[in-house]
Amino acid sequence: MATRVAAAAMIAFALGCSSSAEGPHSGMSADAGDGSMGSPDGASSAASDAGTPPGTDQDAEGNGPPAGTAGNNCPPSWTTTPACGGGSYDAGVPDFGPNVIVFTPSMPMSTIQNQLDTIYAKMDADQFDDLGYALLFMPGQYSLDVQVGFYTHVIGLGESPDDVTITGAVRVMADWLGNDNATQNFWRTAENLAVVPTAAIDDGTDIWATAQGTALRRVHVRGSIALYDDGGWASGGFIADSKIDTQITSGSQQQYLTRNVDLTNWQGSNWNMVFVGDGQPPSGTWPHPPYTVVNATPVVREKPFLYVDSGGNYLVMVPALKTNATGSSWGADAPGSPVPPGSPLSIDRFYIAKPTVDTATTLNAALAAGKHLLLTPGGYSLDGPIEVTQPNTVVIGIGLPVLTPTNGTAALTVADVDGVTIAGLLIQAGAKSSPTLVEMGSPGSSADHSANPTALFDVNCRIGGYIAGTASVCFTINSNDVIDDDSWLWRADHGTGVGWTANMSNSGIVVNGDDVTAYGLFSEHHQSFQALWNGNGGSVYFYQSEMPYDPPNQGAWMESPSEDGYASYKVSDNVTTHLAFGLGVYSFFDNPVHAANAIETPTGSGIVMHHMMTYSSATGGINDIINGTGGPATAYSAN
């Protein structure tokens, strides 16, 4: 659950650091056409070892070699060729199933509005479910009020966000829980569209009052946006690769990450606001206001996105790797001439999965036949893991599909190969406990993937809440160079199957690989370390965590016989290099228990931790910020 708000004294713990953190050198993104940067079709040694030379196409049925697209000779483009992402035919409009709804600007706006209102009435308060909706908008102009409820994914199908322009609102309100409280507005996304707020709706400000497990991506707000609803509590949140023309106001948001967003004018602060690679980030001196500014995003690929070509054919754009990136990837494009951020895949390169039909067997057969996966909305019961074994495979969900293992296995495993993309999934623990729900690389993985890393986007984890379930760990990352972009790893504190001995879970994430990077890591309520980092060279840009509410007593929650509780963020003693910016750890214990530290790390010169804070309620608490220093209650570090 999002943070409970409680009064606590504020203590400044000054170590002396400005709000502009020592980040990577500021600069524009790398040239998307530079093959050395590992385009999404990038051929790797793993691809070659698998027997697929660069540029090799799959056969007409999708059978045969790896799902890697076409090799690193594919230039940035909006169109495919037989050797670069092309399919065997013009696929046209795919059968996405009943919960994917496609709107066109030629439809009467009243008809679209009625359908949107019907869906929203169903999803507004539908906190726990496994069936969502993907709402797809063909390029054009719309006049609509698009309210985004639980498990709702709003997608523009243009090459540029401005190709789909919605005049009115694309908004998330906080009415269902009462008191304009947005702290449980989980699991929803909007991407690749423009919104023009109008005075008739919320006085002309777009409202995006969300909590964890949400995202705005490739969104152009042609006006102002507020991240809270009418002064009510809010606990988010994540925006990436977007542009805000006028003003963005955080209001009551407790914490937030914006990455590669053209902000124009950010207003507001509360506990922990982190800005990575943004255009026009706010200025100030930590901890008043609690801003962390990293000038450029060191290494990232943007999330793949759906779009249609002039013939109405669907494609998936897979953006290229970029380094030292500042600002949105598209905001400087000339109107009407969007620059391709990578190279595309025809939709018929994808196996389109449906929850009423598909199992682990059918999904793995599709992967073995060289297909990528596009999972449509709904709940997928898996008697074994989805096994991604080929480099450059894309597994993408629309409408927040929910994957649940039923036999105590992982829901998803990825081999130690280059360039895999996993996006838009909610992974849920089953009744039979899993050692891990997602595994990236097998134990002992050692390959260098720095030129073409695997990446996760908007992949979230839930243990309990909707169904009773247990898992030791949400994510285990064994491969090197993995990028995790926005993940909420949640042991449920309310809902079905919730209790100290019910939805048991040790950690949200365990990182064993080297040089793993996380942007927007949210991990909450697990029973040991929320995040355990065993690999060297890790980098985290924004961390938000609540310790478990429910330890029954101190004796039941001890890291060692002499140390109370567990640190939320633990960097193992063997680690020599680690970097983190903007970490917030909170405690709201139901019983009078304590954690000795919020964060524990080695103390060598290679361990660099910038801008940490804690918040504790009146019951129990966190004794220190890091390694026995920082003080109790609410405290800020300044380094």
Predicted ranges, named:
Residues 1, 13-82, 90:
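Ser/Thr-rich, Pro/Gly/Ala-heavy low-complexity intrinsically disordered linkers and tails
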Residues 134, 202, 209, 218, ...:
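Structural detector of coil-to-beta-strand junctions
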